[in-house]
Structures are given as C-alpha cells and as structure tokens.
C-alpha cells in the first residue's frame, strides 16, 4: 500500500504535531494490513470446506479446485501479517511510549495486542491452513467410487 497520505486535516483523529502524525501513519498502515488479513480470511471461507465426507467423492475435483483458491487466500494473509507486525513495531518505539491518539483508540488497542502477542493472525492462518491441508489430503485419498 504505497499511496501518499492526505493532509493531517483529514485524519480520523485530531493531529496537533508531527510526532502525532508519524504515529498516526504507522497505526493507519498497521490497521489497514489487519483489515486486509480479515478480508482474505473471509474470501477464503467462501471456497473453504470444513471437512471431507465420504459422500463428497463424486465432486472431489470441484472441491479441490475451491480448496486451492481458499489456500491461496489464506497464504496471502501471511504477507499482510508481516506488514502489520512491522508497522505495529514502528508505532511502538520509545518516542511514542506516552503518546496516545485517543481518537483512534481501537488502533492503539490493536497495536498493543500485537505487541503483547494476544493478537496473532499467524496462529490463525497456521490453524486454518493445517485444517485445510487435512481436508485436501482426505479428498485426494478418496476414490470416486467410494460413494
């Protein structure tokens, strides 16, 4: 996301100095990447299948194609998680330690949750991909005649 930032007058919260503006930009980038992860998870769920049942065998090729799409969506989330973590780290440096932008408290909370480890989309993505790979393996091991 390489777009220029608009004037601080149009920010979601009141910006009074350059230090606040710098932290705002870092938090904005972090928040944007978190939202992109959420969107990729939602998109992946459209194509995902939670479990493979024996009666899915006649349609296994279609399911496998959809599961590959879901896998691609989930894997893309790792890129955004890496970016979000980087921006959260930048917004967490010493010079911002006692600077809180109260107008965007939810972004500050996300930053703190990333810092403390309570918000970790890598774990979520790992879990979803592990489950998805199991479903793919189950479908691949099915014979079309098993139904």
Predicted regions span which residues?
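Amphipathic alpha-helical repeat scaffolds of TPR domains
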Residues: 3, 22-55, 96-117, 123-131
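Soluble non-cytosolic domains of exported or imported proteins
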Residues: 31-34, 38, 61-64, 68-71
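C-terminal amphipathic alpha-helix
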Residues: 63, 68-147
